[in-house]
């Protein structure tokens, strides 16, 4: 079982530790509800060092990445990040990821922890056609810390004075100094709140973590586990691999058409996307339920005539709205907000309705 550079800190802090994709990770500290509300009202600190990270370098690096991802990376500039997807030829999703353009020949990729080995092997398989492209896996050498919430930048500025929120637009990053080294600070996140994700050498993870907690204590900054990370992303309607998206899901049927550039030229899975674009059958929608029953992944969804129309992707009790919410993959004619639905939970049909995403609208990135 793998551990992050902060594992001993989490254990000493009394975090509940779970196996998450082969990593021992904190799922909660004080409690999911309290941690969630802290991020929405003040700030939260996340250890997400289990995420995979690769470098792609070389004269043809951009050309290579354009061929294996769906978004148009050529539209980015140095210092900009882009959310994108890698597809199989049949249009199923290998993974969703963020690519950071350091310069025209150097790119940094952050991928999902559970897909790290698969993703790297898949990239290696396709890199051979692009002479000079070099791939390297740095997942065991780098840590990733996320600071999220409306007070995130105020707290960060006390530890890294060089940060300037006005000079760091959404999905851009800067190299900033800390303890004689450089950190990559990106204005990205998985909560819908303002904030950053910071990539740094393992040796600096605990010093930065503790410095941020000290700087933000009076503002209500708390450590946050993977449990609240999931409820935060679900309130925003963000996809999670293995739930809203997987190897059997086409992005055009998962609310991800906006990251598929059909105009940029050839990429793996393009023809499959074109076929779905002509005749999409399914889509992902948000829903809420009456009462307090909690829908889980795989629960069947029915229409008002009790005909099965899809399955639940994710479900939780929203800490912000105090009601059961979730996402479901449904036949397209049932995606309109306000449409009545019924979710089968432990043999009983629970009434609800389709809701517009996101469920909440905090101060965005």
UniProtKB/Swiss-Prot annotation:
Catalytic activity line of the entry: N(6)-[(R)-S(8)-aminomethyldihydrolipoyl]-L-lysyl-[protein] + (6S)-5,6,7,8-tetrahydrofolate = N(6)-[(R)-dihydrolipoyl]-L-lysyl-[protein] + (6R)-5,10-methylene-5,6,7,8-tetrahydrofolate + NH4(+)
Function: The glycine cleavage system catalyzes the degradation of glycine.
Pfam families: GCV_T, GCV_T_C
Record's protein name: Aminomethyltransferase
Record's keyword annotation contains Transferase: yes
Highest taxon of source: Bacteria
Quaternary assembly: The glycine cleavage system is composed of four proteins: P, T, L and H.
Keywords annotated in UniProt: Aminotransferase, Transferase
The organism of origin for this protein: Chlorobium phaeovibrioides (strain DSM 265 / 1930) (Prosthecochloris vibrioformis (strain DSM 265))
Protein family: Belongs to the GcvT family.
InterPro entries found in the cross-reference section: GCS_T, GCS_T_bac, GCST_C, GCV_T_N, GcvT/YgfZ/DmdA, GcvT/YgfZ_C, TrmE/GcvT_dom1
Enzyme class: transferase
